[in-house]
Structure formats: C-alpha cells, structure tokens
Regions:
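Active-site-adjacent beta-strand anchor residues
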Residues: 33, 60, 111, 130-131
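A glycine-rich beta-strand to alpha-helix segment
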Residues: 117-145
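C-terminal helical cap/extension that packs against the catalytic core
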Residues: 28-29, 71-127
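A general structural signal for well-ordered alpha-helical segments in protein cores
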Residues: 17, 40, 95-98, 137
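Nucleotide phosphate-binding/pyrophosphate-handling subdomain across enzymes
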Residues: 1-80
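Short amphipathic alpha-helical segments
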Residues: 42-44, 70-72, 94-96, 141-144
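Short active-site-adjacent structural elements
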Residues: 39, 66-68, 90-92, 118-120, ...
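Cofactor-binding loop segments of dinucleotide-utilizing enzymes, especially the Rossmann-like FAD-
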Residues: 59-63, 85-86, 133
C-alpha cells in the first residue's frame, strides 16, 4: 500500500520523453508525440493551462496519420505552422501535406528536415510546440542534447 504523498512524490519524478515534455522554458519549447486530433486536444489543454498562445507549431506527422487533423486543431493557437519530415525512411512525408492544407486555406511552411524546422522556428520569439511521430521526437531530442 502506498500513501498519497509517496504516490505524488514518485509521479513528480516520472520522466516520459516526448509526452508533454518541456524542453526549455525560455524560450518555451514543448514536445509531444501527438499524431491525431484527439490527442492534440490534450496538448491544447496543457498549453491553455500554462498560458501559452501564439505559438510556432512544428508538425512532423506522416501522410498515413492525422496530420491534417492536428494542424486544424492547432491553427487557432498558432502564429505559424511548420511542416517537416523525419529522416526515418519507414514514414512517408511530402509537400502534398502542404498542398492539402492549402486547399482548406490553412497556410503552412514546408521544411525538409527537423533541424531546418527548428532553425526556422527559433528565428522568432514565439513559444514553440513540436508535435510528431516518435522518430521526429527522437530527432528533436538529439538536436537539443547537442546544443
């Protein structure tokens, strides 16, 4: 049997990379392995709770997942939406995503790599929210560890 204080203490020590992970507080950078609109609602709830709005959102979700649903969900909180791809050849990413979203009058910026997306996102002071597959999450983690 565990006491409530023990449970709280142990939960506070829990680290789950890529799940609502704050990589930096200044500038604010949040990383989440969100690949559908439903899980995106949880991300938005956390952002609202933290008082984070007007973000640059990086989305690295392959075409066979709900990239469009995630972008639609985040567009009200985003100043910019940057689409990117993982270096993992198992996943398919293309500029067709940008074209599909443009048909819905959702403006996005396409980048060919996670590194390029992070560089572009860092060029302005907005908070950064990075959403994508575990391969994108892994690439972001590696880049942040090197910096």
């Amino acid at each position: 049997v565990f006491s409530l204080p023990d449970i709280r203490k142990n939960l506070s020590l829990l680290h789950w990379p890529g799940r609502m992970e704050v990589l930096r507080s200044k500038p604010f950078v949040l990383l989440d392995a969100c690949i559908n609109a439903t899980s995106c609602e949880n991300v938005k709830e956390v952002l609202r709770h933290l008082g984070v709005w007007n973000c640059t959102v990086i989305v690295g979700i392959p075409e066979d997942k709900d990239y469009a649903g995630v972008v639609r969900s985040m567009k009200g909180m985003a100043n910019r939406i940057i689409l990117t791809r993982s270096g993992n050849p198992h996943y398919h990413f293309s500029q067709k995503q940008q074209e599909t979203l443009a048909e819905e009058d959702i403006g996005t910026i396409w980048t060919d790599s996670v590194k390029q997306a992070l560089t572009l996102a860092g060029s302005c002071p907005d908070p950064i929210v990075i959403l994508g597959t575990t391969s994108v999450i892994s690439e972001v983690e590696q880049i942040f560890q090197q910096s």
